[in-house]
Curated annotation (Swiss-Prot):
Underlying gene: thiG
The protein's name: Thiazole synthase
Task of the protein: Catalyzes the rearrangement of 1-deoxy-D-xylulose 5-phosphate (DXP) to produce the thiazole phosphate moiety of thiamine. Sulfur is provided by the thiocarboxylate moiety of the carrier protein ThiS. In vitro, sulfur can be provided by H(2)S.
Protein family according to the UniProt entry: Belongs to the ThiG family.
First-level EC class: transferase
Region Disordered: start-end pairs: 249-272
Its EC number(s): 2.8.1.10
Predominant subcellular localization, coarse grouping: cytoplasm
Pathway it works in: Cofactor biosynthesis; thiamine diphosphate biosynthesis
Catalytic activity: [ThiS sulfur-carrier protein]-C-terminal-Gly-aminoethanethioate + 2-iminoacetate + 1-deoxy-D-xylulose 5-phosphate = [ThiS sulfur-carrier protein]-C-terminal Gly-Gly + 2-[(2R,5Z)-2-carboxy-4-methylthiazol-5(2H)-ylidene]ethyl phosphate + 2 H2O + H(+)
Entries under PANTHER family matching the protein: THIAZOLE SYNTHASE
Active site positions: 111 (schiff-base intermediate with dxp)
Amino acid sequence: MDSPSPNSDPLTIGGRQFNSRLFTGTGKYPSMTSMQQSIERSGCDMVTVAVRRVQTVAAGHEGLMEAIDWQRIWMLPNTAGCTNAEEAVRVARLGRELAKLAGQEDNTFVKLEVIPDARHLLPDPIGTLNAAEQLVKEGFTVLPYINADPLLAKRLEEVGCATVMPLGSPIGSGQGLNNAANIGLIIENAGVPVVVDAGIGVPSEAAQALEMGADAVLVNSAIALAGDPAAMASAMSQAVMAGRTAHLSGRLPRRDQASASSPTTGLVQSPQ
């Protein structure tokens, strides 16, 4: 089997194709230049943007809309900062208008985040489901950020979400895939793409997610807070491609006992 290249193995979400299975963010970078270089080195073609921070011109987000080539990069507006379903729906609508200002008139994507707890940043399952139902009715392409809950993931798929985005571990924690077993169940049962979002700290964890069968990963903090963000972005890109190739290749089955690599017949016998 030939190794897939990004162009020969696209990911489709909401009818749109993406060549890269690594999505990135725009927060926490030391500078706008660092963000631009990291996006370029990552090879990604979808970047998430916090609508509220852009709307209020929060620190670190000045000039963000002008800093990214929106003819090449697909915008994924997100509802970060929303604590309930009603807020999230309102901010999603603003995000759609923001995408239009970037020249993406047909962009209906939204990364849905409903997070009432500012300390642990864990998503509210009930608020997320309620907001998702409303946004789907309004024609949005909904990518919901959720705990690694297989039942919730299936319910969100049933109401019309374009993906599910289970967390590996809490946002920005760098703890990796603490919920690997549940993520595996989500992948096994999903009829929509599964994008692992949050907690990935190093490229090996991004590769692990793709090896398991996840369709993509979204990585922000691990890149933005690295000693060399652009180099880390490149490493993440390579890891994602390696993980995807490994998944398609099929891993060696696990065994309870050793299995010799060399044949056991025709061995040279030592003289008696």
